[in-house]
Amino acid sequence: MRKPLTPKAKRRLLGLGQDLLILVLVVSAVMLAGGSGLLDFAGDISGGVLGMQSGQNQGGQKEYTAAAEPLSMMLTPEAGAHCGVMYSQEELYSAYDRFSATLAEALGSSGEPEQISEEEWRAALNETGVFFDFYCDFQLSSLAIWLGTEINGPAAGHTARRICISLDNGLVWLSYVRSRDEGGFYRCSTSVQAGEFAARVGESIPNGAEFVFELSPTYDALDPYTVLMQGSIVLGSISGENSLRSADSEALYTAFGLSSYLASTYPESDGTLVSIEGEATLRLGADGELKYSFKPIEDESAPKLSPTDAIELARRLVENTAGRYCGEASLRLSYIYLSAETGEYTICFDYVYDGVPLRISGREHGVEKTESGERET
């Protein structure tokens, strides 16, 4: 049972109304390699793509922060007996903290991926193990990097939203669902120690949680791998308001590498405030919409963004703009897509409150960012 939000908490929850701050960006990989103040606001990433030297730590390694975390987990201490974790950010943090190192080891030691049947995937979900639902698909290589390791082999390029580490015949396996590309269910061998893993998962106490596919009868309208909790779920109420009313305009200029003194600023008839500096344009709409665009200088030799670097750049920019005005909520990666035709990434972030994703009326996503190797619009 959860307590409703206090009035103070409601007042702090900014940016979640229909007029909430929406960030629409189109940024060129060429610009990222050498041309804008956008590179300077966060630092740390480097190496040809995001600047020359500013982005490396003292050990010469790029630094990344996780853009996504599981919004539900299922711990299975013994076959068929589950402990679901949902609707509580504190409990999700605790559970993920307990098993993130195991997930990192499983990813880093994963062998050649083999395709399995859906029945085998479901069997893995019922064995002793841990299931993670990250809310959106992204490359396993990105997840590995966020966890401080790396994947060598074909699995690195596979995208997945749902991942399971399970025990089978004395071995620990990494299984996942590829809902994009060719699709299908896959598993890899790992070097995770079975005894230690089983003991850690065995500390979980079953709470009656189930996957939808385990119900009898099942519900065709629901995703079969949705985690269902037992008992009544009480969610606190939330309120929102236009974030731009409380936004520091100077901080927004700085985040986008603009100067309020150098930019030419004028209002439009609908109340939108437009600021132009060089090839950059920042539009602050009276309805709570913020748009930034930049036309870079073309450079054929500029390196292309990797998916992990594209997500990290987007995360940092979001953190320093819309992320400043989230109140009690947070922004988490919810979508990434790379167009093979245009070389353009579309990266979206959605608001999450206490482990629950939020949908804004009239908006598909909380924040949308597009990065390409071409010009931006």
Residue ranges and their predicted role:
Residues 2-10, 19-22, 26-310, 316-320:
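Preferential activation on post-signal-peptide N-terminal prodomains/segments
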Residues 303-372:
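Extracytoplasmic beta-rich ectodomain segments of secreted or membrane-anchored proteins
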Residues 377:
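Extended hydrophobic
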